[in-house]
């Protein structure tokens, strides 16, 4: 059944039931046309025309034509004739001297009918004078009025409004331009000034549709151009720029149209929950998340193109509107470039096409002169043209290679040159591999940025290591980085560390090959190329070891040190690792990770200096810890006899797994603890190893770990590390290293409350029912398969279990309860959250104290998969 033109509907058909049916038929027709690849520009215009007809027919039905001096006008996006399935329909009822009760009732009936039809209608009833007065004081109203379009009623009244709106007295173009620039800056800052947000807003994100609208609004206000085509015809856009903006708009419109098909309520955010379905609507298919990643790659690339054009054209408008007839004097830099104000400018119109290597010269000059903070619009245009006409990558030009290497060696290049090269598409023009990662995203909660944006942020974080004001946040890197002799090797490794992502296979291995070839082709020595290649191949090694291995086990340190080999490689690796973590997600780096990386670095440095053939004597370590702790305890008034009597209850492992300060702290409170049968819970007053330490002493119970983990989870406290051990006489000596929901140590005010809450929990309860928090909204859109891998330890007496699952609230408590149900002993836990994934390490033994046999491993795997599935259901 085909929809009818609203103009053809009789008065009897203008009822809720019939109109709803007609709207449904029209919407379904548009959805079908969209899936049959009808141009989305035609669809949004067609939708606008349909509602023009519907409103005109209703205007006639309610007899507004009988009222003099009244006009129905579309404003805002509807005024531009751009309507998507869930777009607001903004209308202005323009009237003069018609505000009596009968008129107001008629307006109310019209609007109520539209609302009953479930249409998102925004309406206002104003005179011309009211429009002008309100518009002069409200930029949004002024912008909407600028796009006013006549629909029905008194045409002359609509024309009079347009004359008033487009007069200079309404909004002088200089003020309008500045107001729109300020508005865009504020909008961009809400999205962290990047086109790469995990759940971007199609309309408002930098590079989104609003950036195109801003260009149109300014051009309309100052130049009288009512469309991109008119801007091109007036010479403010080149034909190529016009076609590119049109192409970008068409793609963004298709994404928005597809999103609106999926939604029930108006929204322009491309959330995780809708990315897959939108990708399917647009024909992006692939195994797993490949379809989503392909669509988002095109989406981010489109935002980049819009953002680049927006930046360049606004600079042109700035000159034409604010500085017409004015121009800063040119300060000649060399034969090819000059500085005009704070912008660098090519002195010859076809410089980049004639000598493409001079593109790199421009960025070297920007690095040399901190007063230059951008590229002049004509030079940006020249660069864009030259970039598209290159018949080979810049890295194939010998002169360009030399200049690129100079940039990696320049102390100021990290600060702005590389990010500017990326924004202006020069890194893609230089490196073929870089062009493949532009806009490359990963469908997860861990990586906050696309691969290219992450790599640029990594370079900026490396630059922070040379600033002593960052010493508190990055003590080791700020100490090491200034001493690294060949910083360019670290820079090249940073550029290449993720460059092979999206190709399939191990990106570290593939990137290492690319990095080696790059170094050799750029004249670096083989030892230098080998170092860079090793850094790329091993860029995850330190992070994984610190977060997912027991770095207080000498065997782990020895194995890590063997892979690193020498202190020079260790210094390069720690700088790359820390910058990589910081650039992955702004919330990832915290005091706990800083402590882990520092402990691993220091332990490895000691091992390398001692020599790997001379491992530490564990008995010496136990003696050292006991002697230092004894001295502290004696200074507090305890006798050596009291201390020795307590420690005789503890196993040797306790003195290896804790520092002498922890041992003294535990003993000091245990010796004062009179009732041996009663539990004791301690919380460190000061942050230890980057987190808050919770110590639990209690009669040992199988479910103790699970009970404590469940209670901490309910309080939004995250366990990062746990040491689970017992005394010889059957008492638990469990240590939990925790952070709050903001990844900060627990503040003192909350510590006593937390102790009371833990005491209130019956520590001998069997945690069969685990109360959990509501999972975050985004988790429901991810499916992480629960899996585990069992690894033998060096001695063969314990089992290491690597565990991966969706990071659902209550997960750790569920795992602990499963261990208890199966009679499996937990000795230590390393907890790592990578976005939506939990990647944890557990050290386990059987109920009789040995490693888990194959049968027990299979039983545990089956139980964990079942229990975790129940938790997520």
From Swiss-Prot:
It comes from the Bacteria. GO terms for biological process: regulation of nitrogen utilization. Keywords: Hydrolase, Magnesium, Multifunctional enzyme, Nucleotidyltransferase, Repeat, Transferase. One of its GO terms (molecular function) is phosphoric diester hydrolase activity. Transmembrane segments: none annotated. Residues 451-573 form the HD domain. Residues 333-692 are annotated as: Uridylyl-removing. SUPFAM superfamilies: ACT-like, HD-domain/PDEase-like, Nucleotidyltransferase, Nucleotidyltransferase substrate binding subunit/domain. InterPro entries: ACT-like_dom_sf, ACT_dom, HD/PDEase_dom, HD_domain, NT_sf, PII_UdlTrfase/GS_AdlTrfase, Polymerase_NTP_transf_dom, UTase/UR. Residues 693-777, 800-873 form the ACT domain. Its EC number is 2.7.7.59, 3.1.4.-. Its cofactor is Mg(2+). Residues 1-332 are annotated as: Uridylyltransferase. The keyword Repeat applies. It catalyses: [protein-PII]-L-tyrosine + UTP = [protein-PII]-uridylyl-L-tyrosine + diphosphate; [protein-PII]-uridylyl-L-tyrosine + H2O = [protein-PII]-L-tyrosine + UMP + H(+). Uridylyltransferase (UTase) activity is inhibited by glutamine, while glutamine activates uridylyl-removing (UR) activity. NCBIfam families: PRK01759.1, PRK05007.1, UTase_glnD. Modifies, by uridylylation and deuridylylation, the PII regulatory proteins (GlnB and homologs), in response to the nitrogen status of the cell that GlnD senses through the glutamine level. Under low glutamine levels, catalyzes the conversion of the PII proteins and UTP to PII-UMP and PPi, while under higher glutamine levels, GlnD hydrolyzes PII-UMP to PII and UMP (deuridylylation). Thus, controls uridylylation state and activity of the PII proteins, and plays an important role in the regulation of nitrogen assimilation and metabolism. Has four distinct domains: an N-terminal nucleotidyltransferase (NT) domain responsible for UTase activity, a central HD domain that encodes UR activity, and two C-terminal ACT domains that seem to have a role in glutamine sensing. Belongs to the GlnD family. This is Bifunctional uridylyltransferase/uridylyl-removing enzyme. It comes from Aliivibrio fischeri (strain ATCC 700601 / ES114).
């Amino acid at each position: 059944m085909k929809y009818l033109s609203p103009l053809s509907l009789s008065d009897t058909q203008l009822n809720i039931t019939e109109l709803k049916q007609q709207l449904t038929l029209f919407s379904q027709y548009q959805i079908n046309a969209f899936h049959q690849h009808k141009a989305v520009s035609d669809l949004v215009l067609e939708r606008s025309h349909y509602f023009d007809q519907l409103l005109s027919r209703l205007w006639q039905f309610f007899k507004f034509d009988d009222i003099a001096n009244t006009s129905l006008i579309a404003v805002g996006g509807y005024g531009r004739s751009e309507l998507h399935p869930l777009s607001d329909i903004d209308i202005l009822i323009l009237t003069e001297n018609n505000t009596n009760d009968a008129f107001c009732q008629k307006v109310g009936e019209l609007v109520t009918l539209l609302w009953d039809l479930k249409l998102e209608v925004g309406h206002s009833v104003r005179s011309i004078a009211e429009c002008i007065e309100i518009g002069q004081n409200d930029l949004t109203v002024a912008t909407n009025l600028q796009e006013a379009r006549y629909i029905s009623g008194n045409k002359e009244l609509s024309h009079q409004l347009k004359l008033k709106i487009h007069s200079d007295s309404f909004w002088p173009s200089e003020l309008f331009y500045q107001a729109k620039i300020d508005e865009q800056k504020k909008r961009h800052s809400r999205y962290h000034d990047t086109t790469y947000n995990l759940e971007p807003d199609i309309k408002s994100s930098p590079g989104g549709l609003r950036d195109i609208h801003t260009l149109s609004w300014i051009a309309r206000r100052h130049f009288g151009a009512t469309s991109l085509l008119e801007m091109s015809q007036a010479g403010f856009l080149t034909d190529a720029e016009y076609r590119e903006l049109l192409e970008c708009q068409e793609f963004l419109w298709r994404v928005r149209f597809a999103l609106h098909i999926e939604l029930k309520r108006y929204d322009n955010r491309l959330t995780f929950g809708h990315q897959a379905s939108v990708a399917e609507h647009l024909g992006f298919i692939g195994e797993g998340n490949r379809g989503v990643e392909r669509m988002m790659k095109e989406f981010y690339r489109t935002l980049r193109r819009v953002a680049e054009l927006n930046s360049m054209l606004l600079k042109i408008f700035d000159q034409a509107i604010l500085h017409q007839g004015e121009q800063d004097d040119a300060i000649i830099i060399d034969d090819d470039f000059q500085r005009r104000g704070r912008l660098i400018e090519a002195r010859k119109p076809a410089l980049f096409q004639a000598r493409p290597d001079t593109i790199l010269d421009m960025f070297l000059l920007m690095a040399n002169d901190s007063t230059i903070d951008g590229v002049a619009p004509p030079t940006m245009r020249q660069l864009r043209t030259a970039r598209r006409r290159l018949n080979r990558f810049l890295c194939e030009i010998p002169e360009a290679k030399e200049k690129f290497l100079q940039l990696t060696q320049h102390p100021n290049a990290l600060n702005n040159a590389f990010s500017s090269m990326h924004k202006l598409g020069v890194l893609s023009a230089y490196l073929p591999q870089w062009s493949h990662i532009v806009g490359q995203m990963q469908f997860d909660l861990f990586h906050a940025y696309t691969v290219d944006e992450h790599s640029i942020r990594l370079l900026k974080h490396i630059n922070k290591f040379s600033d002593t004001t960052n010493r508190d946040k990055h003590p080791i890197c700020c100490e090491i980085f200034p001493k690294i002799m060949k910083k360019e090797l670290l820079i090249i490794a940073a550029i290449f560390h993720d460059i092979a992502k999206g190709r399939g296979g191990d990106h570290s291995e593939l990137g290492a090959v690319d990095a080696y070839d790059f170094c050799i082709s750029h004249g670096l020595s083989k030892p230098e190329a080998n170092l860079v290649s090793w850094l790329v191949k091993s860029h995850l090694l330190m992070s994984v070891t610190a977060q997912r291995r027991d770095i207080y086990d000498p065997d782990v340190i020895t194995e890590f040190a063997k892979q690193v080999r020498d202190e020079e490689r260790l210094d390069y690796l720690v700088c790359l690792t820390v910058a990589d973590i910081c650039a992955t997600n702004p919330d990832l780096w915290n005091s706990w990770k800083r402590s882990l990386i520092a402990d691993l670095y220091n332990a490895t440095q000691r091992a390398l200096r001692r020599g790997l053939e001379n491992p530490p004597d564990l008995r010496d370590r136990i003696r050292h810890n006991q002697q230092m702790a004894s001295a502290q305890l004696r200074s507090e008034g305890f006798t050596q006899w009291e201390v020795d009597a307590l420690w005789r209850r503890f196993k040797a492992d306790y003195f290896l797994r804790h520092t002498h300060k922890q041992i003294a702290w535990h003993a000091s409170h245990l010796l004062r603890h009179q009732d041996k049968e009663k539990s004791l819970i301690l919380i460190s007053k000061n942050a230890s190893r980057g987190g808050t330490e919770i110590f639990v002493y209690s009669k040992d119970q199988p479910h103790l770990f699970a009970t404590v983990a469940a209670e901490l989870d309910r309080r939004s406290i995250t366990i990062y590390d746990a040491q689970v051990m017992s005394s010889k006489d059957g008492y638990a000596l469990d240590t939990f290293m925790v952070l709050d929901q903001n990844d900060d140590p627990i503040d003192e005010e909350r510590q006593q409350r937390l102790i009371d809450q833990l005491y209130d929990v019956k520590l001998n309860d069997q945690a069969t029912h685990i109360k959990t928090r509501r999972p975050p909204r985004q988790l429901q859109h991810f499916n992480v398969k629960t899996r585990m891998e069992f690894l033998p330890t060096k001695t063969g007496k314990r089992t290491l279990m690597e565990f991966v699952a969706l990071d659902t609230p209550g997960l750790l408590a569920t795992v602990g309860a499963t261990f208890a149900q199966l009679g499996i002993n937990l000795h230590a836990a390393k907890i790592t959250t990578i976005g939506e994934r939990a990647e944890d390490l557990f050290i386990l033994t059987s109920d009789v104290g040995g490693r888990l046999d194959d049968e027990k491993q299979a039983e545990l795997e089956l139980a964990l998969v079942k229990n975790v599935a129940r938790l997520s259901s």
